Amino acid sequence: MSYQLYRNTTLGNTLQESLDELIQCGQITPHLALKVLLQFDKAINNALANRVKTRLTFKAGHLSTYRFCDNVWTFVLKDVEFREVQELVKADKVKIVACDGKSVLFFLFSSLFSLYGK
């Protein structure tokens, strides 16, 4: 099973909009569009698990809320700093969703933040 977390990213939204347009023009069927989205889910999860080598660290000023439901952790953090080598990015609020997928945790940083506290 592949999680559908990344459909809500810029790439995922653009893909869905393009597929909707193709369906409306009659160039593909809704069934084919669904197959494309399912393949996207598998491919993006695989790529993030196996190809991304960059590491970053983050530190939160405050854990606002957390919950665990159906093997999915959700954390809402406030006053967060992300650091990668020499670059520092600050966020007012970050939501992290972590799903257990075959012993690998996938993270989604979403909706998040105003850069540098703006």
From Swiss-Prot:
<dbReference type="InterPro" id="IPR009083">
    <property type="entry name" value="TFIIA_a-hlx"/>
</dbReference>
<keyword id="KW-0804">Transcription</keyword>
<dbReference type="Pfam" id="PF02268">
    <property type="entry name" value="TFIIA_gamma_N"/>
</dbReference>
<comment type="subunit">
    <text>TFIIA is a heterodimer of the large unprocessed subunit 1 and a small subunit gamma.</text>
</comment>
<keyword id="KW-0539">Nucleus</keyword>
<protein>
    <recommendedName>
        <fullName>Transcription initiation factor IIA subunit 2</fullName>
    </recommendedName>
</protein>
<comment type="function">
    <text>TFIIA is a component of the transcription machinery of RNA polymerase II and plays an important role in transcriptional activation. TFIIA in a complex with Tbp mediates transcriptional activity.</text>
</comment>
<dbReference type="GO" id="GO:0016251">
    <property type="term" value="F:RNA polymerase II general transcription initiation factor activity"/>
</dbReference>
<dbReference type="InterPro" id="IPR009088">
    <property type="entry name" value="TFIIA_b-brl"/>
</dbReference>
<dbReference type="Pfam" id="PF02751">
    <property type="entry name" value="TFIIA_gamma_C"/>
</dbReference>
<dbReference type="InterPro" id="IPR003194">
    <property type="entry name" value="TFIIA_gsu"/>
</dbReference>
<dbReference type="GO" id="GO:0051123">
    <property type="term" value="P:RNA polymerase II preinitiation complex assembly"/>
</dbReference>
<dbReference type="GO" id="GO:0017025">
    <property type="term" value="F:TBP-class protein binding"/>
</dbReference>
<comment type="similarity">
    <text>Belongs to the TFIIA subunit 2 family.</text>
</comment>
<dbReference type="GO" id="GO:0005672">
    <property type="term" value="C:transcription factor TFIIA complex"/>
</dbReference>
<dbReference type="InterPro" id="IPR015872">
    <property type="entry name" value="TFIIA_gsu_N"/>
</dbReference>
<keyword id="KW-0805">Transcription regulation</keyword>
<dbReference type="InterPro" id="IPR015871">
    <property type="entry name" value="TFIIA_gsu_C"/>
</dbReference>
